[in-house]
Amino acid sequence: MAVGDAPLEKVALETYVPPAKPSLIGLSRAEISERLAAIGVAPAQRRMRVQQLWHWMYVRGAKTVGEMTNVSKDMRAELEKHVTVDRPEVVAEQISNDGTRKWLLRLPSGNTLEKPHEVECVYIPETDRGTLCVSSQVGCTLNCSFCHTGTQRLVRNLTAGEIVGQIMVARDRLNDWADRETPHGNRLVTNIVMMGMGEPLYNFDAVRDALLIVADNEGIGISKRRITLSTSGVVPNIVRTGEEIGVMLAISLHAVRDELRNELVPLNRKYPIAELMQACRDYPAASNAKRITFEYVMLKGVNDSLDDAKLLVKLLKGIHAKINLIPFNPWPGTRYECSDWEQIEKFSEYVFNAGYSSPVRTPRGRDILAACGQLKSETEKLSARERQALRAMAMTD
């Protein structure tokens, strides 16, 4: 199929079917109150009960209703008949040589006729922070040609509970809840990036609801300035992101000419660069203190020339921006190569001298296929030959 004929977006194969006993994870306070009303909790008690449940779920990380010891025994028994506080199940964990962790998570579902679906979630520890890369879809709506996830079919959108559940799983695995000890007394998951599997702005409502729960000061409590949502450029929902969520914004740009971006990010044929840049200028939360990050994967001989760097600087005029240069992370079957390090440095230096911060992202988790652009759920397993190719790539980098 020619590049110009490739579909801009994939259609989801399925819709979400909840388990017989749904989880309270991902519900708003109002929705939890409705669940309590449905099982007969008196109106005068609901507000207090909601706060108790919220605290146990998002501050103390309770895995069962039975752990909630300040909720009456009778109330716990009634709740356990109807709801859970389940999160996704960890079915595999890989730990990279650099400390990066990747979890393969199986999603609970009420659809017993289908194979359970899985997504990947990645934890990246650094000296001053711990970043969790979270998925928003099973597969991805888009067909970005340099991205491994883009080769996977779109199965369905994740629910708010499945998105929040990834953060809760990470805190479970790292023992990172408020009443538990962590090294040096610091929280281990300090930053969230919506840069995992999927296009977040094609699952706007669930992503919004999940991130508002994550940022809630009476629960998980991660500041909106430490949450970054990355989009390939779903222009109509960019301003909504600033107005309704208010988190940091990242744009997967990767090219400065429409002709090339049409190939790398086919969504560009629907929302071309000029429209995308205007949406960024209109982004409500942008300021010099809250700059928009432009992600730019460095592809050898494709988008890494100094002419590209010059055009990038022109495009960013009038936008509070920083540029994150990403060395291409190889995956089996890709036709792209990473730019030479010398060329990456030249590109970065030009952009920096033009007045924009332009750090080069350190690749993390390449050896476990956890780096940027490498995620692909185990529902589409790599063959033995592909795994051998991956190991060879990691050894040569």
From Swiss-Prot:
Q: Does the entry feature the keyword DNA repair, yes or no? A: no
The protein's GO terms of the molecular function aspect are: 4 iron, 4 sulfur cluster binding; metal ion binding; rRNA (adenine(2503)-C2-)-methyltransferase activity; rRNA binding; tRNA (adenine(37)-C2)-methyltransferase activity; tRNA binding
Gene3D superfamilies in alphabetical order: 1.10.150.530, Aldolase class I
- Main EC class the enzyme belongs to: transferase
State how the cofactor is bound.
Binds 1 [4Fe-4S] cluster. The cluster is coordinated with 3 cysteines and an exchangeable S-adenosyl-L-methionine.
Matching PROSITE patterns: RADICAL_SAM (PS51918)
The record lists [4Fe-4S] cluster as bound by C140, C144, C147
Q: What cofactor requirement does the entry state?
A: [4Fe-4S] cluster
Its domain of life reads: Bacteria
Residues that, per the record, bind S-adenosyl-L-methionine: G198, E199, S230, S252, L253, H254, N329
Q: Where is the protein localized?
A: Cytoplasm
Indicate the segments forming the Radical SAM core domain, all copies.
126-369
Q: Which UniProt keywords apply?
A: 4Fe-4S, Cytoplasm, Disulfide bond, Iron, Iron-sulfur, Metal-binding, Methyltransferase, rRNA processing, S-adenosyl-L-methionine, Transferase, tRNA processing
For this UniProt entry, what's an example GO CC term?
cytoplasm
Q: Which residues form the active site?
A: E120, C372
- Main location class: cytoplasm
Its function, per the record, reads: Specifically methylates position 2 of adenine 2503 in 23S rRNA and position 2 of adenine 37 in tRNAs. m2A2503 modification seems to play a crucial role in the proofreading step occurring at the peptidyl transferase center and thus would serve to optimize ribosomal fidelity.
Which HAMAP family does UniProt cross-reference here?
RNA_methyltr_RlmN
Family according to the record = Belongs to the radical SAM superfamily. RlmN family.
By its UniProt entry, which NCBIfam families does this protein fall under? rRNA_mod_RlmN (TIGR00048)
This one is known as: Dual-specificity RNA methyltransferase RlmN
Which organism encodes this protein? Nitrobacter hamburgensis (strain DSM 10229 / NCIMB 13809 / X14)
